[in-house]
Curated annotation (Swiss-Prot):
Alphabetical UniProt keywords: Leucine-rich repeat, Repeat
Pfam families cross-referenced by the UniProt entry: F-box (PF00646), LRR_At5g56370 (PF24758)
InterPro entries recorded: F-box-like_dom_sf, F-box_AtFBL13-like, F-box_dom, FBL60-like, LRR_dom_sf, LRR_FXL15/At3g58940/PEG3-like
Keyword Repeat set for record: yes
LRR repeat copies, ranges: 14-39, 157-184, 190-209, 211-237, 322-353, 354-379, 396-424
Name of the molecule in the record: Putative F-box/LRR-repeat protein At5g41630
SUPFAM superfamilies the record matches: F-box domain, RNI-like
CDD domains: F-box_AtFBL13-like (cd22160)
Record lineage: Eukaryota, Viridiplantae, Streptophyta, Embryophyta, Tracheophyta
Highest taxon listed in the record's lineage: Eukaryota
Length: 455
C-alpha cells in the first residue's frame, strides 16, 4: 500500500523518466502541443531536441482571420514558429517531418525546411502545402537537389499546389526510398528517367497532376518505368498539357504491381506494357483536344497508329481482375472497339457514365470478358443520337421480336454476369447544375436505391 501511495501521491512521475523516453512520448503529439510542454519547467525546454517526429499543422496554430492582412499575419507567425522549433532542435537527428500548411505565404521557406531536415538524416518527409499563387502557370519552385541523394529517406510525399520543378544533379541515389508521391510538378523526360532509375527499392509511386517540361528534349522521347519491387503505381498526368504526349514513348515493366491508376492521353507509342501481377486497375484514357475536334457525329477520330497504341496498352493490363473505366476511356473505346483484347481474368467491371458519352463500345467490351461476374454502372447516362432510334444501334434500347416481346441484347444474354449494380440509380443529371449540388443529390439517390435492394 505504501508503494501505491508513493506512486500516485501527486508526484511528477513523467519528469523522472529519461530524457530520451520523454522525447519519444512527445513525438506522438502534434508539435505545437509538444512545444507547449516547455512552459512546465525549465527542464522541459531542451527535451524538444529528443523529439524525433515533427508534425506541423497550421490549422491547429492559427486563429480565425477575417481579413487578408490577418491571414498573412497568422501565416507569418506559423512559419516563424516552425523556424523556431527547427532552430531549437539544432542538429538533432529526426525521423519524420510532416507539414500540413494551408496558408503558406512563401514556399521558399518550406524548401529551406527540407534542406534542414535532410541534414539530420530524416527518413520520412510529408508536405501538403497550399499556395497563394494563381494556378498551374505560376512560377515553379525547384526542389533542393540534395533530396535526391538522401541515403536515409524511406518515404517522400510532396504536394505543392504552387507547383514544383524537379531537377536533379549528376546522379540520383535513393537506396532506401519505398514510397514516393509527387503532386503538381514539372519535370523533363530525361530527368524523370534518371529519377526512376535511382529508386531501386521503390514499392509505391504516385505522380498526380504533372506536366512534361518540353524544353531541350530530343524526339522521340522515351520514358521508362522499370521498378522490380513496385506494387502500387498511380500515373495521372495534367490534362491541360496533353499535346506534350505527342512525342512520348512509354515503357512500363513492373512485374509486381498489383494496383494501377493510369490517367493520361494516348501516348505516341507504348513500347512495352507489362504488369504480370496486376489485380486492380483504374483507367482514364482521354482524347486530346485535336482528336475531339475532328469528330464526325458521335464518332471521334483517331488514327490507326493511335488505335494500335490503345490496344497495346490494354493488352498489357488484360490480366487484371478488377477494372474501372472512366467515361473518357469509354469514349476512346468507341474509336477502337474492334481491337479490344480479351480480359480473361476480369471478374468485376465498373463503367463511369456521363451524358455526353455513347455506349456503343460496351457490347464489344462485354463480349471480351468471358469470366465477368459483377458489372457496375456509375449512373445510367449516355448521349442521345440518331442511333437511339435504331433498335440494333443502341444498347439502352430494348429490341423486340416479331410478336412484340422484349428480347435481351446478345451481349447481355451471353454474358456470364451474375451481379449488376447501378450507382446513383434514378439520378437526373443536369449538365448546367453545380457539381456540389449533384453530389448532394447522389447521396439521397444512393440511399434510396440501397433500400430498394433490401426490399
Amino acid at each position: 500500500m505504501s508503494k501505491m501511495k508513493d506512486f500516485g501521491g501527486g508526484r511528477d512521475i513523467i519528469s523522472d523518466l529519461p530524457d530520451a523516453l520523454i522525447g519519444h512520448i512527445l513525438s506522438f503529439l502534434p508539435t505545437i502541443e509538444a512545444v507547449a510542454t516547455t512552459v512546465l519547467a525549465k527542464r522541459w525546454k531542451p527535451l524538444l531536441s529528443f523529439v524525433h517526429s515533427l508534425d506541423f499543422d497550421d490549422s491547429l496554430c492559427l486563429h480565425p482571420a477575417k481579413t487578408n492582412e490577418e491571414k498573412r499575419t497568422n501565416a507569418t507567425s506559423f512559419m516563424r514558429f516552425v523556424d523556431g522549433v527547427l532552430a531549437l532542435q539544432g542538429n538533432a537527428r529526426i525521423n519524420k517531418f510532416r507539414l500540413n500548411g494551408k496558408h503558406i505565404i512563401n514556399e521558399r521557406w518550406v524548401l529551406d525546411w527540407i534542406q534542414n531536415v535532410l541534414k539530420r538524416d530524416v527518413s520520412d518527409i510529408r508536405l501538403y502545402v497550399s499556395s497563394c499563387s494563381d494556378g498551374f502557370d505560376s512560377s515553379f519552385y525547384h526542389l533542393p537537389p540534395e533530396i535526391f541523394v538522401s541515403q536515409t529517406l524511406v518515404t517522400l510525399i510532396i504536394m505543392f499546389e504552387g507547383d514544383i520543378n524537379i531537377s536533379v544533379g549528376r546522379e540520383v541515389s535513393l537506396p532506401k526510398l519505398k514510397t514516393l508521391h509527387l503532386y503538381h510538378f514539372k519535370i523533363k523526360l530525361s530527368t524523370f528517367n534518371k529519377l526512376i532509375s535511382g529508386c531501386h527499392a521503390l514499392e509505391e509511386l504516385m505522380m498526380i497532376n504533372w506536366k512534361w517540361d518540353e524544353s531541350s528534349e530530343p524526339e522521340p522521347c522515351f520514358v521508362t518505368i522499370y521498378l522490380p519491387n513496385l506494387k502500387i503505381l498511380e500515373y495521372c498526368r495534367f490534362e491541360r498539357y496533353d499535346e506534350a504526349n505527342d512525342k512520348v514513348s512509354l515503357l512500363f515493366h513492373n512485374p509486381k504491381v498489383v494496383y494501377l491508376e493510369f490517367f493520361d492521353s494516348i501516348a505516341d507509342r507504348y513500347q512495352q506494357v507489362s504488369f504480370g501481377s496486376l489485380v486492380e486497375a483504374r483507367l482514364g484514357i482521354r482524347l486530346t483536344y485535336d482528336q475531339v475536334y475532328n469528330h464526325l457525329e458521335t464518332e471521334y477520330y483517331v488514327s490507326s497508329k493511335e488505335k494500335s497504341n490503345v490496344t497495346n496498352l490494354l493488352t498489357g493490363i488484360c490480366n487484371v481482375k478488377i477494372l474501372y473505366l472512366s467515361d473518357e476511356t469509354l469514349e476512346v473505346f468507341g474509336c477502337c472497339r474492334d481491337t479490344i483484347p480479351v480480359f480473361s481474368n476480369l471478374i468485376e467491371l465498373t463503367i463511369q457514365t456521363k451524358p455526353h458519352i455513347i455506349w456503343k463500345p460496351l457490347p464489344a467490351m462485354l463480349n471480351n470478358c468471358p469470366n465477368l461476374i459483377t458489372l457496375i454502372f456509375e449512373g445510367m447516362h449516355h448521349i442521345y443520337s440518331d442511333r437511339c432510334e435504331d433498335e440494333d444501334g443502341c444498347l439502352c434500347r430494348y429490341p423486340t421480336n416479331f410478336v412484340g416481346g422484349v428480347v435481351a441484347r446478345p451481349c447481355l444474354s451471353s454474358s456470364p454476369v451474375k451481379v449488376l449494380k447501378i450507382l446513383n440509380f434514378g439520378e437526373i443529371c443536369d449538365v448546367h447544375e453545380d457539381d456540389e449540388d449533384d453530389d448532394d443529390d447522389d447521396d439521397d439517390e444512393d440511399e434510396e436505391f440501397v433500400y430498394c435492394l433490401r426490399e
